[in-house]
Structure formats: C-alpha cells, structure tokens
Curated annotation (Swiss-Prot):
Region (Disordered): 113-158
Protein name (record): UPF0145 protein Psyc_1853
SUPFAM superfamilies: YbjQ-like
Source organism superkingdom: Bacteria
Gene3D superfamilies: Hypothetical protein apc22750. Chain B
Membrane-spanning segments: none
Organism: Psychrobacter arcticus (strain DSM 17307 / VKM B-2377 / 273-4)
Family under the similarity heading: Belongs to the UPF0145 family.
One Pfam family cited in the UniProt record for this chain: YbjQ_1
Bias type Polar residues, positions: 113-122
Length: 158
C-alpha cells in the first residue's frame, strides 16, 4: 500500500488505529545564478517567475518523497496533519520542510443507510393559521383577570 497523505487530522473513510511518530522531510535549495538574473529582469516587467515556480515544485516533491521514505520505514499507512514550512538558511538558499504524523489506518466499514417509510406523527392541530385556537384547560387564558387586588398597568389605557 502506498502511503496516503492528508492535511487533515484524520484520513477520510479510514479509521486510525495507531499513531506511530512525527515524520518529516526537507531540502535546502539555492537559486541558479543564470536563472536568478533572468528572474530579476522578469521582476521589472512583471509576470510569473517560472524558474522559481519550478524550483519550489521540485523542492516540495523532494521533501515529500523524503518524508514518505521515513513513514514507510515505520510501517505507516498514511501521514496526517501534513504541513509545509520554509526558512532562509543563507543568502540565496532556502529550506523547504514538510512534516506530519505517521499513522496506521484501516478502511471504515460502510454502514448501509436505511430510510424509513414511516412518517413521524404530525403535530397539526387541525386549525388553519388564520383561525383562533381554542384555549384548553392546560393553557391559561390570556384574557383571564388576576385574582389578587393588585393594581395592573395597562399600556393601552383600558
């Protein structure tokens, strides 16, 4: 099985059975002087710096490959929580670092989805939205007078 990669903390449709260790891969690259001069000219007129794009793509792949070798050595099925980091090492040289957690994982069993043909009981009272509901004994009437002798404030002046 090839090592699967996920930037999530889990692997979709898999159950993580064991966390093995943190694994990483890195590469340090420097710019090519000739490509750097061309990139400097391109920077003046604008546009994509394809030499740098290619350099970064190669660096990412090399760092990932090195991390996968370490994960395979641990017997991992996947690496989760995948992250990238970069740092400047020296003038014109940068490190690309990738890391994650090597795990053992097994596919989850797909549970069949059952749909019930029974509908939940309706709570419809039989009244339309325009009819005034009939108060029941369980519901106190809003028009009932208070039984105490305290004065009541009525904002409508009634």
């Amino acid at each position: 099985m090839t090592v699967q990669l996920s930037n999530l903390e889990h692997l979709p449709n898999y159950q993580i059975t064991e966390r093995l260790d943190v694994v990483y891969g890195s590469t340090v690259r420097s710019k090519h002087v000739g490509k750097d001069l061309f990139a400097g000219l391109k920077n003046i007129v604008g546009g994509e710096l394809t030499a740098y794009t290619e350099l970064l793509e190669e660096s990412r792949q090399e760092a990932i490959d090195r991390m996968i070798v370490k994960a395979e050595a641990l017997g991992a099925d996947a690496v989760v929580g995948l992250r990238f980091s970069t740092s400047s090492i020296a003038q014109g040289a940068s490190e690309l670092f990738v890391y994650g957690t090597a795990v053992k994982a097994v596919p989850m069993q797909q549970q069949p989805i059952y749909q019930s043909s029974n509908q939940p009981p309706s709570h419809h009272s039989g009244h339309s939205q325009y009819e005034e509901p009939v108060p029941s004994a369980a519901q106190p009437s809003t028009t009932a007078q208070a039984n105490d002798d305290l004065p009541r404030f009525n904002p409508f002046g009634e």
